[in-house]
């Protein structure tokens, strides 16, 4: 149940993000401290629309962090992965710890991105059983 809900939230957020990335629209500005507290309180009371506001207003942070680690080929993938970190961060944020939401979720986003980058780096060294041994990528034999 939890993973299905998280996946649905992720898809919804990625669609919102895709609209910003592909169009001329800009990301919503980050919430100020009082607005952030208001929406966190509403979300704590079960208001899912408040959670969506928190997600939308922190997408700029996701894009900023993803750009630090991305090249031209994987920016969109890292933004999607960072969005998962954003959602996880909002779900686990504890306002009683006296830190700003943006501080906490920036670590969650960065951790999610780095975790995926580490796992994909491990896979780069693996060789498929279908790959020819002794030839390069275009099929020339090595001597």
Model-identified regions with their sequence ranges:
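Conserved small/polar residues in nucleotide/adenosyl-binding loops
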Residues: 141-143
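Alpha-helical promoter-recognition and RNA polymerase-docking modules of transcription initiation factors
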Residues: 2-122
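Long, serine/threonine/proline-rich intrinsically disordered regions in eukaryotic cortical polarity
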Residues: 133-137
């Amino acid at each position: 149940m939890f993973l299905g809900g998280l996946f649905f939230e992720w898809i919804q957020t990625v669609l919102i993000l895709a609209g910003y990335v592909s169009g001329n629209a800009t990301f919503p500005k980050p919430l100020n401290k009082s607005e952030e507290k208001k929406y966190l309180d509403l979300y704590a009371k079960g208001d899912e629309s408040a959670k969506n506001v928190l997600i939308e207003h922190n997408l700029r942070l996701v894009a900023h962090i993803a750009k630090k680690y991305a090249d031209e080929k994987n920016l969109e993938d890292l933004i999607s992965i960072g969005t998962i970190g954003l959602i996880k961060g909002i779900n686990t944020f504890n306002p009683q710890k006296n830190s700003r939401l943006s501080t906490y979720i920036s670590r969650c986003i960065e951790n999610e991105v780095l975790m995926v980058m580490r796992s994909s780096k491990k896979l780069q060294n693996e060789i498929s059983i279908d790959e020819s041994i002794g030839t390069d990528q275009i099929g020339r034999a090595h001597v």
